[in-house]
Amino acid sequence: RELMRTNYVKYAVADLNKDGKRELTVLRANQDGEGVADCYVSKNGVLTLRSSVLVSMTMAELSQQGKVTVGVLRSNDPALFITGVADGARAITDVLALRGGELTNLVLSAITGVSGEVSRFCSVYPMDINGDGVTEVPRTVTLQGEDADHAVSQRVDWISYDASGTASRVLSTYHDVADGWYLQLPEGWPERVWVGRSTSPDEIGITFYTDSSREESYVPVLRITALSGSERERLAVRTGRFILGRNDGVIYVGELLKGNQDWKYSVTEDEVRASFSLIGTEWSAGDN
């Protein structure tokens, strides 16, 4: 039988108050065109509206590339991470949790009235990036000395939240979404590296650079290359290269460069392997 009927753009089913029963949260537009999250609870076999809260994105921004992620706060409380994408370029993320039985937006700015979690969209969404059981929000940051308009120049800081809405950076990554991989940036790298991209028919390389105290120019530290084409097996074992992974006919290789040798934050081949990951299909797909 029918329990309720409502218009919506996306929805989530999750036990937000940890009572063993799952609540239904639907995202819709109100009469003024604003985005609203409605939380319904089941009472006597009927879904009843418990509370509502405004969200920071329009339903158009949510419906196209947006996503609703059921996740967990640093305080081990369940939460909904609502991501909308404005103009295909800016990611806006709200973090919704129940406080005293009321749906609350933990990242709402008292000054602007919308989420403080806004940054360049890089086709990644909230997830547990490090396997600690807590959901992190991706926040893009321009690498030092780089043009903010260049997607290649963005690192991703992964931010966790507690029940009071306090943010904490957990780690930073460099995501090469176009080529299907990301690297967890080692200690000391996030504020000290920038990147360059080079392409040829069978090789696409990302080179990490740092500044040198002995030279005015930047020096290369690490290069990660995606090899395709018929010569990839031979090219993968070229002197200095080490294999990081394989996927769909592509071999990913690393190469430690001269800037790594005497640098305070130098890395080993094994450390690069441990920090390298392939991007799964779930990264770039929105859902309910």
Language-model segments: residues:
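Surface-exposed loop/turn elements that mediate protein-protein interactions on large endomembrane-trafficking
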Residues: 1-4, 38-58, 94-113, 158-168
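Beta-propeller blade termini
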Residues: 9-16, 63-73, 121-131
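Acidic/hydrophobic-patterned starts of short beta strands in beta-sheet-rich repeat architectures
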Residues: 18-27, 72-84, 129-141
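Structural motif
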Residues: 32-41, 88-97, 144-160
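Loop/turn-rich, solvent-exposed surfaces of beta-rich toroidal or solenoidal domains
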Residues: 76-94, 186, 192
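Conserved blade-ending motifs and adjacent loop-strand segments that build the rim/top face
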Residues: 107-127
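Secretory pathway targeting signatures of secreted, lumenal, and periplasmic proteins
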Residues: 186-237, 242
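Surface-exposed amphipathic alpha-helical segments
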Residues: 254-288
